[in-house]
Amino acid sequence: MLEQSESHAFINNAPKEDRIQVKFEQLFESLPLPLRAEEALSKLRHDSARLMILKTSDPTLNMSTYSIEDSPMGFECLKYNLSDNNKLLSQNNYRLPDYLEEDEIVSYTFSKTGPTTSKNKHPSHSNTIRSPPYKVKKESCHTEINNVSNVSTESINVIDASRGYSPYTSVDSLSVSKNRSFISLEESASNQYDAAEAFYFNADSSSPLRKLSPIELPVTPIRRKTPTINPNSELKRLQTFGKLILHKGSRRR
């Protein structure tokens, strides 16, 4: 468990000399990227980098942000300000610690005071979800996720397997917004409102993962059946709106 008081903040100026090549997943190919991918990737060190997408209208950040993750050991995260005609205005490199392992859920946030991180081992998948540590009061629950076409039921497949992603079969809570355009999946360590990891997407789009967006306030979630994470673990709190990142991939060592 990594408490917020123990969160690590890391300084700028991580090495970025080596150019790398990355084959983008369909998810990222379908997204409009104001920042040229090769320009961003040229600033990373390792050959196992993966693209993380974050676009936010958070007034505290006052920018649109796209992040690139670079990690066989630890993380190299680049933050770009794209608010001026989609040009690269500023860049901050943050070095996160090397203790992160595979199959961990990691909460990561960019802030004015620097990045912080918390982690929790998750037994069911190797995907990593990034989201800011806002507070959330949400009852933990569990559901099986099966079908992406019917957002009005309890069976929702948030990940299209044909795109190379494994379905999340043990997400702790599921809710659909009132207009059923957005779906929220949150993972929680217990019933104590003490942890949540969420990603949002537009379920009305022809490609569910094409647009990552903030969600409306959710409807009542489904009741928990069985816990899927160690109840002794904790993740940072987050709110059901804000900037969120969906990030896929097993780390290559």
UniProtKB/Swiss-Prot annotation:
The keyword Cell cycle applies. It is found in: Cytoplasm; Cytoplasm, Cytoskeleton, Microtubule organizing center, Spindle pole body; Chromosome, Centromere. One of its GO terms (cellular component) is spindle pole body. GO terms for biological process: cell division; mitotic sister chromatid segregation. Residues 113-136 are annotated as: Disordered. Coiled coil: none annotated. It comes from the Eukaryota. Keywords: Cell cycle, Cell division, Centromere, Chromosome, Cytoplasm, Cytoskeleton, Mitosis. Component of the CENP-A recruiting complex that ensures the integrity of mitotic spindles through maintenance of kinetochore factors mis6/CENP-I and cnp1/CENP-A. Seems dispensable for proper chromosome segregation. Component of the CENP-A recruiting complex composed of at least mis16, mis19, mis19 and mis20. This is CENP-A recruiting complex protein mis20. It comes from Schizosaccharomyces pombe (strain 972 / ATCC 24843).
